[in-house]
A protein has these predicted regions:
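Extracytoplasmic cysteine-anchoring/structural motifs
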Residues: 1-249
Length: 250
């Protein structure tokens, strides 16, 4: 994968870099003026760009494309800015399906806070130890807040058990499509992601946790994107470690 920044893009932003991430979370960052290509194994790749204008204290992160990389292919991403309309455009080589992507990079859009998550009923850095077959006493939920409005909520799952149930490794909870039935069947519940999405939504893992067996970890990672294309600064990760239910008999 190669990245190209036009002069208009370079003049509009004081600092910038592109990031290509694999579905496993490995990342390669293309810093300013980097012209070398990076090599990736075939599979899903996620392209993001980090930008900051002069005078801004924080950078903005945009998810620009998710695509399937094939063996022996070279992919070129070109970043440009139409200064008159304050629009950032990202175009792709013919190997990547889809038209160019456009983002509002006006001061109002750049100053809008990125989406963020709040955990309820669990601590992100601590594995959640559930009892196999029992619903947690407290609700285990994740709240997403996007001031500009929610565009998508991406759930990445690492669980051999759920994979065997045809549960998707990656799914947009705002548009689950064919996976909606299995998500519901296994107990995952959402509010605020259906139909006309607003600023807040909830992902409820409580009933899903009841159905998870012992024998390892089940990892769920959430990432949100707002209507401007900004992504949450930090993904929210829930790690569930079910324990067996043992009874002592006198």
């Amino acid at each position: 994968v190669k990245v190209n920044y036009t002069d208009e893009f370079k003049n509009y932003f004081s600092d910038y870099s592109a990031v290509i991430a694999t579905s496993l979370g490995n990342e390669v960052e293309y810093v300013k003026d980097e012209t070398r290509a990076a090599y990736f194994s075939p599979g899903e790749l996620i392209a993001k760009v980090k930008v900051k204008k002069s005078g801004q204290s924080t950078e903005n992160v945009y998810q620009v494309k998710v695509f399937e990389a094939k063996a022996r292919h070279i992919y070129l991403l070109t970043f440009d800015v139409e200064a008159g309309s304050a629009t950032m455009t990202v175009s792709f080589s013919d190997d990547v399906a889809g038209e160019e992507v456009r983002f509002d990079v006006s001061d109002a859009a750049l100053n809008s806070p990125a989406p963020y998550f709040k955990a309820n009923g669990f601590t992100e850095s601590v594995p959640f130890q559930s009892i196999e077959g029992a619903e947690p006493k407290e609700q285990v939920t994740a709240y997403v807040n996007a001031v500009a409005g929610i565009q998508s909520c991406r759930l990445t799952t690492t669980s051999g058990f759920l994979s065997g149930k045809e549960w998707p490794d990656v799914v947009d909870l705002a548009a689950p499509g064919k996976y909606a039935s299995i998500l519901t069947e296994m107990g995952l519940e959402t509010k605020g992601l259906e139909g006309n999405r607003d600023q807040m939504a909830q992902v409820n893992f409580t009933k899903l946790i009841k159905n998870l067996p012992t024998g390892g970890n089940h990892i769920f990672k959430l990432e949100a994107t707002d209507v401007y294309g900004k992504v949450s600064d930090t993904p929210l990760v829930l790690t569930v470690t079910p324990q067996g239910c043992e009874f002592a008999v006198a």
